[in-house]
């Protein structure tokens, strides 16, 4: 009989209890009889996945007589090994809590109450609202006469709570309807991750995976409080420490993470580029970089064209009227063949390496210290410890979260870290990488499946009006390289897009009609359809209705007062949630008369994780299947809402006709949602009999790998990255629970037979950079892959080609970049080819030493009467506010505040401040406090603590305070949204808001009305 970790623990538990009690002289007969009467006795074990952060711990749900009786961590899962954080441990309580929505509810315009309705009536009403809006508002052609087929009056928000299969359903439905205003949580949490990592490496995902952290020699945690916000992931950090790694925490406040690290270095929020830029300067000036890695695998030798310049904080090509750059001024110098000119000697003053060196020479210890508030001694402490990994036998990893992303320079924060890791040779290696600590349960998968306005599934660009035909699209989005040793993998894009369209429109999609490409909605070039612009257009009355599923923007979006006012202007709204939230109940928020709110609201009860089946993708790209443990009652999963809703809309078009019905009627749709059917659709099918190698496949069989996808209509795939996850030979690979490894794989904890991960089950991205040009590992003691003379062994290599020493067949390791090299210098970002320090939109300074340009010259903002930004060094608001999550609450708290034991542990909104600031303001620990920004105010309880200290910045004292954002008015007397204070200023690349740095003032409250 096979013994699993779980069965072993059960046996050990019984034997240990028996041994202990027997030694104490107890009669064990009664105790043993009682032990078998545990509440899980006779219960069925069902595997599910925790619905909170992207560690995605696996959970055992115990079911007896169709009812959930208990949940616990799965000890067999290699990542969590049975462990759960406070939220995961409360999974059973969240399922059973009395606040769950159980039936569809309806709020009529101007009504002050909810009314119960049945599903059929509710979906019929929603279908009618959607069709009427689509018939009236569909834009067939733009002002230039170009076919665009888009619907702007309806929006879709959500959700990273959806499974991959639900995401596939939602995306296909929205594009069929013509919706362009589609976004989800990734926009406001980790959108800079994709934009930054893809610019440097080619892909936007976490480079390594959770278990791999144990292999590192140095951990730099910056912009994250990992111990509190990713507790299970943190155990792999502690494994690294047990193995001898040095742990560093750089963060504005001292926390549990700081306490477990070797040292903590506080820095002022919003100054990460200055801090990291100083490290870049330190590496180059001290000659600490990994020369072979830099020379062979990066674009350090590329020569930049003569139009490039940088002067006083501004790159060449800047237009102050439009606040944008002409990025053509940053292009590389071209040779006679049209390819990049390179100088392997690195002597050309315009080669990337020398331009980078010059750019960061200004980032001296003094300048960095003056801006960040970090002493020169502490700067060197971090720099020296981390830069010691810039050698073949060492590796360092950087871990970050929203402390980096939620800034007007969020993308460039992360980009700066890529410069460091490339200089040190820490990408592609075990224990290396830049690893995003994502906080949403399927934010990786929901981004892969593109619940975002600007991309199609698999990170393909969303069509714009200029690309009228599929040929136009392919020409604009398929890169061409002159370098024969570059794989240029995106040259395969036409195959992936044709297969996607075939999956969406089935037999209707043919080569003759461009695979129904015309049906896709087309964006206007340069227009932003993201969350923040949806809300601004809503505020100005330009939207009629929409869907908000599994997200609570009325609590978690910045400048919340504006957001709440905007929602009042909708004609209708459809929400799907586990509980009432600040969004679902916006019409009856404090200070508002429900009778004055016209919005018609349909509130649909959402199925809990244990009530549905499907897959999620954790932050390390592992595709994990979860089974349905119990029936959902009248609650429904998101796909079981959208599948019948689309069918009802289709029925209306068949009966009545209407505007542009074909994109809806010709969808390759289904009558009923079956999650495993959609898992197969995501993988993809052959639509014609095909021979692959010596194996023949029939129409309707599964495509075995994305290498077999075609651009001729003979294959389909709803996401090329996931092709190979479900095959005729091996079935559904996301269900695999096989912990077997080769000794080489086990040495670094790859677990290649547990679940499956994209792409092609590769566990460490860019792993061909972990070897030298002969295919030998830089660090043989922690080899990821190795060339044995005929093939690669270890992890699945980033391409099958031989090592670079083979001049004819060898390929560069960064295969998703056009020219195959990792990029120190990149031309694809809106705010510069190199990261540059700029102050936050709201800053306590009126100057800094790096340039005369105070804040980013291209950050985005709105100009309505409710969009205000405090002036630099505003004496009315002298204090920096940063926001953060809590261990016990998930993000905005909409779910966890409804779990009594979690609310009891963290019951109310508080503000952390230093003793010095408290003394200055006459505030004592436990006092009620009013916190005010130029946009709004919030109440909080003072937590006076030495965990936060004042900073000395540019010769003056700057105070910082911190507040969680997990509270809202629907939970009585706990406080309301912190985001009423935060600023509506956004990164120019991804429009993520700057929630981690704004200006406020604090005072002792005479009276509290929001907190008991």
Swiss-Prot record:
Query: Which keywords does UniProt give here?
Result: 4Fe-4S, Calcium, Electron transport, Iron, Iron-sulfur, Metal-binding, Oxidoreductase, Periplasm, Selenium, Selenocysteine, Signal, Transport, Tungsten
Q: What is this protein called?
A: Formate dehydrogenase 2 subunit alpha (cytochrome c-553)
- What this chain does, per the record? Alpha chain of the formate dehydrogenase (FDH) that catalyzes the reversible two-electron oxidation of formate to carbon dioxide. The alpha subunit of formate dehydrogenase forms the active site.
Q: Where is the 4Fe-4S Mo/W bis-MGD-type domain?
A: 43-99
Q: Which organism is it from?
A: Nitratidesulfovibrio vulgaris (strain ATCC 29579 / DSM 644 / CCUG 34227 / NCIMB 8303 / VKM B-1760 / Hildenborough)
Q: How is the cofactor bound?
A: Binds 1 [4Fe-4S] cluster per subunit.
Instruction: Report the gene name.
Output: fdnG-3
Q: Name one GO molecular function term.
A: formate dehydrogenase (cytochrome-c-553) activity
The EC number of this protein is 1.17.2.3
PROSITE patterns assigned: 4FE4S_MOW_BIS_MGD (PS51669), MOLYBDOPTERIN_PROK_1 (PS00551), MOLYBDOPTERIN_PROK_3 (PS00932), TAT (PS51318)
């Amino acid at each position: 009989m096979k013994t699993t970790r779980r069965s072993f623990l059960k046996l050990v538990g019984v034997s240990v209890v028996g041994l202990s009690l027997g030694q104490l002289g107890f009669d064990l007969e009664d105790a043993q009889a009682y032990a078998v009467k545990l509440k899980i006795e006779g219960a069925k074990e069902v595997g599910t996945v925790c619905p909170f952060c992207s560690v995605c711990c696996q959970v055992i749900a115990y079911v007896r007589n169709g009812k959930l009786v208990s949940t616990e961590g799965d000890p067999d899962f290699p990542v969590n090994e049975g462990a759960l954080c406070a939220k995961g441990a409360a999974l059973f309580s969240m399922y059973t809590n009395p606040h769950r929505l159980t039936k569809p509810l309806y709020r009529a315009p101007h009504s002050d109450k909810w009314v119960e309705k049945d599903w059929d009536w509710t979906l019929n009403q929603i279908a009618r609202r959607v069709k009427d809006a689509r018939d009236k508002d569909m834009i067939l052609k733009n002002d230039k006469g170009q076919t665009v087929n888009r619907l702007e009056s309806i929006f879709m928000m959500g959700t990273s709570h959806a499974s991959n299969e639900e995401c596939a359903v939602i995306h296909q439905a929205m594009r069929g309807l013509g919706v362009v205003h589609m976004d989800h949580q990734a926009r406001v949490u980790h959108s800079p991750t994709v934009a930054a990592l893809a610019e440097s490496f080619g892909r936007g995902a976490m480079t390594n995976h959770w278990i791999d952290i144990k292999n590192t020699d140095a951990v730099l945690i910056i912009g994250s409080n990992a111990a509190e916000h990713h507790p299970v992931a943190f155990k792999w950090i502690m494994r690294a420490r047990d193995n001898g790694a040095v742990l560093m925490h750089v963060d504005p406040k001292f926390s549990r993470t700081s306490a477990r690290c070797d040292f903590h270095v506080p820095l002022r929020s919003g100054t990460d580029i200055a801090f990291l830029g100083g490290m870049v300067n330190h590496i180059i000036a001290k000659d600490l970089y990994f020369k072979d890695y830099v020379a062979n695998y990066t674009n350090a030798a590329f020569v930049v064209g003569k139009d490039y310049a940088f002067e006083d904080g501004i790159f060449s090509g800047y237009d102050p009227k439009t606040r944008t750059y002409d990025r053509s001024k940053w292009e590389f110098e071209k040779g006679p063949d049209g390819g990049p000119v390179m100088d392997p000697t690195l002597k050309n003053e315009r080669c990337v390496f020398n331009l980078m060196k010059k750019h960061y020479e200004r980032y001296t210890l003094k300048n960095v210290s003056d801006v960040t508030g970090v002493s020169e001694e502490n700067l060197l402490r971090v720099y020296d410890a981390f830069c010691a990994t810039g050698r073949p036998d060492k590796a360092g990893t950087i871990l970050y979260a929203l402390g980096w992303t939620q800034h007007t320079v969020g993308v460039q924060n992360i980009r700066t870290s890529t410069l460091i890791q490339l200089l040190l040779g820490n990408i592609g290696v075990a224990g290396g990488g830049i690893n995003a600590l994502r906080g949403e349960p399927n934010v990786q998968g929901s981004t892969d499946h593109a619940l975002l306005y600007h991309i199609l599934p698999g990170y393909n660009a969303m069509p714009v009006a200029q690309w009228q035909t599929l040929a136009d699209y392919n020409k604009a989005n398929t890169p061409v390289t002159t370098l024969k040793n570059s794989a240029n993998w995106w040259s395969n894009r036409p195959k992936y897009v044709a297969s996607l369209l075939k999956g969406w429109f089935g037999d209707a999609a043919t080569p003759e009609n461009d695979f129904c490409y015309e049906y896709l909605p087309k964006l206007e070039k340069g227009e932003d359809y993201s969350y923040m612009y949806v809300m601004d257009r809503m505020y100005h009355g330009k939207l009629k209705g929409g869907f908000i599923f599994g997200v609570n923007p009325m609590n978690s979006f910045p400048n919340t007062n504006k957001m709440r006012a905007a929602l009042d202007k909708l004609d209708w709204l459809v929400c799907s949630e586990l509980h009432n939230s600040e969004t679902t109940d916006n019409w009856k928020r404090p200070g508002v008369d429900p009778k004055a709110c016209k919005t018609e609201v349909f509130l649909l009860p959402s199925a809990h994780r244990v009530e549905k089946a499907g897959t999620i993708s954790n932050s390390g790209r592992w595709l994990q299947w979860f089974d349905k443990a119990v029936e959902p009652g009248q609650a429904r999963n998101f796909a079981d809402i959208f599948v019948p809703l689309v069918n009802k809309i289709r029925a209306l078009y068949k009966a009545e006709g209407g505007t542009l019905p074909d994109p809806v009627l010709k969808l390759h749709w289904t009558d009923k949602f079956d999650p495993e059917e959609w898992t197969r659709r995501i993988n993809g099918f052959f639509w014609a009999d095909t021979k692959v190698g010596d194996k023949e496949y029939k129409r309707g069989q599964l495509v075995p790998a994305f290498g077999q996808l075609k651009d001729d209509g003979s294959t389909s795939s709803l996401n090329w990255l996931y092709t190979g996850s479900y095959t005729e030979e091996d079935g559904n690979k996301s269900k695999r629970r096989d912990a077997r490894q080769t000794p080489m794989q086990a040495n670094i904890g790859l677990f290649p037979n547990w679940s499956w991960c994209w792409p092609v089950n590769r566990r460490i991205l860019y792993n061909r950079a972990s070897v030298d040009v002969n295919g030998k590992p830089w660090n043989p003691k922690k080899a990821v892959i190795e060339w044995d003379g005929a093939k690669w062994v270890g992890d699945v290599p980033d391409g099958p080609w031989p090592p670079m020493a083979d001049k004819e067949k060898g390929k560069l390791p960064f295969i998703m970049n056009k020219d195959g090299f990792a990029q120190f210098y990149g031309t694809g970002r809106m705010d510069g080819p190199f990261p540059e320090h700029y102050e936050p939109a709201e800053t306590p300074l009126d100057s800094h030493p790096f340039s005369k340009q105070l804040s980013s010259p291209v950050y985005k903002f709105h100009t309505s009467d409710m969009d205000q930004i405090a002036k630099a060094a505003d004496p009315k608001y002298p204090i920096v506010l940063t926001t953060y999550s809590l261990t016990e609450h998930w993000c905005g708290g909409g779910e966890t505040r409804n779990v009594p034991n979690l609310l009891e542990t963290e019951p109310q909104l508080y503000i952390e401040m230093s003793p010095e600031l408290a003394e200055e303001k006459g505030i004592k620990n436990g006092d009620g406090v009013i916190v005010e920004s130029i946009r709004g105010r919030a109440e909080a309880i003072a937590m006076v603590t030495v965990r936060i200290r004042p900073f000395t910045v540019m010769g003056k004292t700057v105070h910082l305070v911190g507040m969680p954002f997990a509270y809202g008015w629907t939970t009585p007397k706990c406080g309301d949204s912190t985001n009423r204070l935060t600023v509506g200023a956004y990164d120019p690349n991804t429009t993520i808001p700057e929630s981690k740095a704004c200006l406020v003032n604090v005072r002792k409250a005479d009276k509290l009305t929001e907190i008991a």
